[in-house]
């Protein structure tokens, strides 16, 4: 199974390779930054945009990806879980990223409350998402249900901005990427 996970992870990184430099700029890794990557899989992309962080934690619900990630990226910490119930104390991270994964969250309101809770004061949320018109077709719904238990919920950038505002995030920005868009907000 690790061969399949490796192939899928590498394919995902190849598809997003043009967005990784922008993502790294938004995450702004540094020696004082603790990063949580929600839905980070085996961490293959994470090491490309977050290297230089003091601590990198991958939160992933798929045990196969966690097993592969622990072997492939031993310096990273891997935790099984979902965004709706983050198993971390308050103020644990200066950055939280969700790279092409927020649309898989079953309860976005609960997830954003949890994300805000674990972000330290002044910490930043970085979302990289896909445009609905390009990815919300029947194939995405079927594949999402098969792989994640429910179909994905793709958001327009302005809708995601409004959701972040409603959850108390500030300094929100939306920028276009090569294969999607970025939304950032601070606690």
What are these regions (language model features)?
Residues 3-17, 45, 126-184:
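C-terminal alpha-helical "lid/dimerization" subdomain adjacent to the S-adenosyl-L-methionine
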Residues 13-33:
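Conserved alpha-helix/loop element of class I SAM-dependent methyltransferases that forms part
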Residues 34, 55, 77, 92-94, ...:
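Structural signature of beta-strand start/N-cap positions in the alpha/beta core
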Residues 36, 41-85:
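Class I SAM-dependent methyltransferase SAM/SAH-binding core
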Residues 97:
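A conserved beta-strand element that flanks and buttresses the S-adenosyl-L-methionine
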Residues 109-121:
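A short glycine-rich, Lys/Arg-flanked "PGG" loop and its adjoining helix->strand segment in the class I
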């Amino acid at each position: 199974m690790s061969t399949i996970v490796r192939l899928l992870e590498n394919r995902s990184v190849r598809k997003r390779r043009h967005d990784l430099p922008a993502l790294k700029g938004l995450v702004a890794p540094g020696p004082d930054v603790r990063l949580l990557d929600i839905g980070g899989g085996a961490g293959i992309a994470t090491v490309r945009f977050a290297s230089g962080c003091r601590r990198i934690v991958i939160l992933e619900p798929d045990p196969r990806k966690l097993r592969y990630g622990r072997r492939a990226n031993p310096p990273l910490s891997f935790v099984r879980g979902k965004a709706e119930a983050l198993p971390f104390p308050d103020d644990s991270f200066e950055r939280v990223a969700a790279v092409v994964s927020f649309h898989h969250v079953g309860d976005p309101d609960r997830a954003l409350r949890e994300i805000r809770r674990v972000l330290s004061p002044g910490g930043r949320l970085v979302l990289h998402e896909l445009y609905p018109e390009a990815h919300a077709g029947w194939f995405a719904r079927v594949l999402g249900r098969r792989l994640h238990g429910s179909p994905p919920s793709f958001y327009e950038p302005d809708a995601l901005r409004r959701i972040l505002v409603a959850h108390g995030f500030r300094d929100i920005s939306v920028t276009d990427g090569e294969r999607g868009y970025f939304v950032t907000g601070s606690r």
